[in-house]
């Protein structure tokens, strides 16, 4: 498989985290409806929220349905430095309970050297135009995320908004229902974020605008069911799902989180395909979808620092049915760090995230090993720096990234002919988190 094809079939989720029944929305239907749907939703929200805010209920809702005091939503996961709106909109949806409405709207511009075939040297794009609807409390809970997006990732082609939304996870990328009989135990099902890895799927969920090299070896969003159980200081999750959005329910994954204190935590996560599946699409890379993988993520979070070292191992077993005639593995490590200036600083609102990564693959083409990076046996390192500013719901950030690959297979690396071994990008993203 050519490198461009493999990289098109990119996967952390984003979660760092991991069954709707049915297939993804088709690209053509999605392309024609994304922006119309967003406009209709915006108009509908305006019509609903105005009377909802003006009207006071004469009856006290049931205790489990009573809206909580305004606070930032914890879904989608946003580990920083960007933070969610602390005063989210909400309205009473009757039998559906109190519904919180938040979202992300952001364009970006990108410049790169050594672009892949079909890619552009410079471009502008909508990176997010999404609404989030959720009921996060009570016995019955739900979350629905709708809209358009892109998923920029290091060392891969950039796909515009229409193609990314249509060919990855559709205009409804995440949606699930959850039953939580106790605070410690819950069951959920739908389109879920992966449990594996340290980075999440969408730009606003991460320290950096672009996802990293390690993220590209992990699932991002899966259809499936998940059990969650908390027994302080431990939290467990177990999922049966379709892995890399394959619509083949042959994956099992799980995670265990140990919270030492409010500043330190450790997450061990693993998953894999217990069968061999031959599906290959943009969202479902053939070899990665037939892999097993393990990640170990430690996080230290104490202002002004957040530091996350991260280890990853993956293995694709030999299977002639998918073209892997010998097995191959990847070994990777990363450090994600962020420094945020305090409120008493003249640079209040500014943060400086940085990411270092190294990823190595095994095998060789002569023995029929699968290509997991830039040819069998190749390796790569990256650095990403993303100065960020946020004021209330507004944010702006600029990003420099550089990827350098070694032991590449000619034709499977960077540039129009796949012969270059480095790629540098500059990205700027701005928007609102309402």
Q: Language model features by range: what are they?
A:
Residues 84, 126, 172, 332, ...:
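Short, conserved clusters of charged catalytic residues that mark active-site
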Residues 2-3, 60:
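Low-complexity, intrinsically disordered or signal/transmembrane-proximal segments
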């Amino acid at each position: 498989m050519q490198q461009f094809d493999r990289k098109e079939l990119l996967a952390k989720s984003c979660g760092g985290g991991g069954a709707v029944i049915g297939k993804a929305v088709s690209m053509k239907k999605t392309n024609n409806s994304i922006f119309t749907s967003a406009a209709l939703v915006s108009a509908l929200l305006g019509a609903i929220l105005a009377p909802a805010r003006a009207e006071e209920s004469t009856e006290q809702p049931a205790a489990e349905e009573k809206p909580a005091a305004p606070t930032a939503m914890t879904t989608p996961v946003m580990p920083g430095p960007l933070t969610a709106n602390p005063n989210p909109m909400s309205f009473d949806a009757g039998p559906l309970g109190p519904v919180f409405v938040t979202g992300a709207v952001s364009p970006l511009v990108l410049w790169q050297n050594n672009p892949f075939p079909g890619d552009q040297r410079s471009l502008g794009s909508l990176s997010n135009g999404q609404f989030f609807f959720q009921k996060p409390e009570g016995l019955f809970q739900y979350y629905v995320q709708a809209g358009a997006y892109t998923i920029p990732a290091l060392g891969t082609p950039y796909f515009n908004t229409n193609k990314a939304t249509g060919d990855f996870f559709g205009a409804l990328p995440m949606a699930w229902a959850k039953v939580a009989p106790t605070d410690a135990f819950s069951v959920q099902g739908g389109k879920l974020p992966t449990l594996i890895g340290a980075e999440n799927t969408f730009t606003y969920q991460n320290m950096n605008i672009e996802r990293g090299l390690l993220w590209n070896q992990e699932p991002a969003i899966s259809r499936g069911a998940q059990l969650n159980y908390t027994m302080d200081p431990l939290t467990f999750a177990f999922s049966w799902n379709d892995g890399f959005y394959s619509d083949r329910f042959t994956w099992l994954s799980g995670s265990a989180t140990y919270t030492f204190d409010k500043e330190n935590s450790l997450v061990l996560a693993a998953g894999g395909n217990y069968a061999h599946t031959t599906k290959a699409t943009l969202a479902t890379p053939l070899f990665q979808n037939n892999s097993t993988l393990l990640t170990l993520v430690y996080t230290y979070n104490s202002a002004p620092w957040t530091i996350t070292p991260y280890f990853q191992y993956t293995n694709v077993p030999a299977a002639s049915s998918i073209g892997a005639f010998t097995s191959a593995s990847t070994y990777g490590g990363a450090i994600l760090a962020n420094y945020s200036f305090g409120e008493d600083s003249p640079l209040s609102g500014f943060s400086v995230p940085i990411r270092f990564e190294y990823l190595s693959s095994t095998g060789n083409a002569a023995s029929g090993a699968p290509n997991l990076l830039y040819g069998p046996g190749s390796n790569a390192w990256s650095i990403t720096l993303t100065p960020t500013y946020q004021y209330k719901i507004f944010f702006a950030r600029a990003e420099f990234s550089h990827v350098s690959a070694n032991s590449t297979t000619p034709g499977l690396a960077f540039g129009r002919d796949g012969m270059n071994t480095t790629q540098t990008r500059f990205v700027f993203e701005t928007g609102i988190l309402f």
